[in-house]
């Protein structure tokens, strides 16, 4: 495994234009609280290497201690300074007095009949988000579906999370902490190296929230995850799903270069305006153009177009052909997802014949189009079913 210094070169940050700046200004209104305990101790999880070095310098620790701590936190998964044998006991005590290495609290953990597991995590301010582990049905590996926000601002009509207004963004510690807590649950520490099999083999940013509306925090969390001296998960094993925040897609491709998934779900603006209201701001033409220029896309790393199959709504043969026309020339695959019902939902999943017919048309055009087998439906852990009871407190002036 390469070290951080030998990893893929870090891209220079892209200077934001006016629309990027507007998005980031709005994100600041939903900023996470500081990663500080009530007793004043600072959380080291979620800090970049530079921030960790600075935090230790403030208490007189040399820079090499940051490298040691990084190894203990992200490679070994350790939360107790007292067992860090490469650090002298007096310094262990100083670290414990000034810092913590946190995990989100597990409020609830449910396991499906198909072994999918869902956690309800509570953060320091009492807000909650859900995380799901989806095991591969054949091999000893699986994906961790991570949330980026508490609630969501997009109000997609078929999505349970969309019925929960946005409360706030999650910070880097809360995002990477979901993956670390999942590793705790499955005992996958220290981090597997090289070709060693990983039970938690991939991350999909497909949980609660729109990752590109919380881009800076997501970016920092994923850079921590990808660092070769810690968790060391390759960017090829990370997929970010967006409903189409077009201005941030270029930055994501340049700065993170992770795999991209697009929540498409319709092939006309008229229908997508209804199903995915964000389409009114960034219509299909602009979204597809952004996909064509996404820097990380290639035949080896295809863009995934996610398509929720709704009975009688978006599952006709004509729509399958239009989908093929839209994505022609893009290195892509199409995931067909039968709608997963949730309490109060108004849709039903497409019928098996419609699913098979749609898939066949897309496949015959040269695109892989698997029909996703629902996982975790019985515990409301399937695609589009996540939701918590967190609410944004009204400010009292």
From Swiss-Prot:
Its main location: cytoplasm. SUPFAM superfamilies: Radical SAM enzymes (SSF102114). Binds 1 [4Fe-4S] cluster. The cluster is coordinated with 3 cysteines and an exchangeable S-adenosyl-L-methionine. Its cofactor is [4Fe-4S] cluster. InterPro entries: Aldolase_TIM, Methyltransferase_A, RlmN_N, RNA_MTrfase_RlmN, rRNA_lsu_MTrfase_RlmN/Cfr, rSAM. Disulfide bonds join 145-383. HAMAP family: RNA_methyltr_RlmN. This is Dual-specificity RNA methyltransferase RlmN. It comes from Granulibacter bethesdensis (strain ATCC BAA-1260 / CGDNIH1).
């Amino acid at each position: 495994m390469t070290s951080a210094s030998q990893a893929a070169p870090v891209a220079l940050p892209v200077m934001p234009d006016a629309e990027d700046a507007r998005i980031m200004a709005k994100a600041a209104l939903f900023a996470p609280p500081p990663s500080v305990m009530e007793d004043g101790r600072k959380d080291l999880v979620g800090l970049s290497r530079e921030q960790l070095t600075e935090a230790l310098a403030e208490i007189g620790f040399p820079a090499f201690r940051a490298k040691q701590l990084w190894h203990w936190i992200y490679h070994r998964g350790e939360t107790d300074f007292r067992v860090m044998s490469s650090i002298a006991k007096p310094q262990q005590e100083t670290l414990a007095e000034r810092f913590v290495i946190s995990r989100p609290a597990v409020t609830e953990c449910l396991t499906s009949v198909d072994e999918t597991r869902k956690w309800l995590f509570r953060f320091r301010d009492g807000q909650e988000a859900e995380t799901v582990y989806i095991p591969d049905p054949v091999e000893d590996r699986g994906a961790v579906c991570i949330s980026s926000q508490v609630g969501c601002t997009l109000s997609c009509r078929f999505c349970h999370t969309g019925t929960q207004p946005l409360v706030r963004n999650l910070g880097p510690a809360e995002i990477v902490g979901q993956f670390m807590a999942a590793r705790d649950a499955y005992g996958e520490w220290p981090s597997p190296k090289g070709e060693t099999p990983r039970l938690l083999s991939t991350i999909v940013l497909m949980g609660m929230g729109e990752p590109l509306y919380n881009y800076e925090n997501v970016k920092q969390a994923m850079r921590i995850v990808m660092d070769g001296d810690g968790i060391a998960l390759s960017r090829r094993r990370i997929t970010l799903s967006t409903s189409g925040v077009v201005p941030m897609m270029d930055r994501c491709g340049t700065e993170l270069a992770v795999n991209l998934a697009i929540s498409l779900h319709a092939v006309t603006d008229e229908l997508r305006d209804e199903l995915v209201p964000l389409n009114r701001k960034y219509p299909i033409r602009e979204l597809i153009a952004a996909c064509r220029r996404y820097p990380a896309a290639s035949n080896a790393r295809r863009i995934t177009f996610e398509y929720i199959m709704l009975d009688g709504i978006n599952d006709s043969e004509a729509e399958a052909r239009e989908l093929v026309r839209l994505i022609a020339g893009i290195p892509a695959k199409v995931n067909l997802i039968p709608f997963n019902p949730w309490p109060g939902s108004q849709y039903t999943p497409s019928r098996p014949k419609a699913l098979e017919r749609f898939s066949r048309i897309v496949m015959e055009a040269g695109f892989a189009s698997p029909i996703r087998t629902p996982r975790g439906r019985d515990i409301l852990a399937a695609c589009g079913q996540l939701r918590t009871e967190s609410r944004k407190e009204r400010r009292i002036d």
